[in-house]
Amino acid sequence: MAIARRCAYKIHPMDITKISTGDNPPEEINVIIEVPVGGEPVKYEFDKESGALFVDRILHTPMRYPTNYGFIPHTLSPDGDALDAMVVARSPFVPGCVVRARPIAVLMIEDEAGGDEKILAVPVDTTFPYYNRVGERSDLPHIVMEQIEHFFTHYKDLEKEKWVRIGKWGDKDEAFRIVRESIERAKQSK
């Protein structure tokens, strides 16, 4: 017979409003992780109202995320969501954690909902110095960009009425511009 145990701790939803965009945006940003690198094909999303992490959907195409994936708080993309961010790291980060990161590029994507830019970033040097010499996407192995493009090209393949078109990669300056614009857009929407 199984004995029920009381949980010794409570999980409290995160108050996203108390997490800043970063110490020095756009050069240093905070990314709230929703999906870890190599994670199961489950798309999680934070609910802005409750601060809880919800399962958005199980990806129909059995693929694993090539980076840690999340969003930059207090930003707003043209699609109405927070600005997406991919954090390259050798280790998976737990969904719900906040990672301080440096943008190095941006991938322009269009899907059935419209434009959907994704910032490519690496952890700040004090978090993980492995990437301290990475200043642009060209400093990463080329296969990293190929894996990211392949993932986003195909991860919706088996979902009806969904599609993705990969656009161009923008450099660090373009990523900074998009971060700044998304911060301004979020401020204006309040």
Which role does the model predict for each range below?
Residues I11-K190:
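Hydrophobic N-terminal alpha-helices or hydrophobic patches in metabolic proteins across all domains
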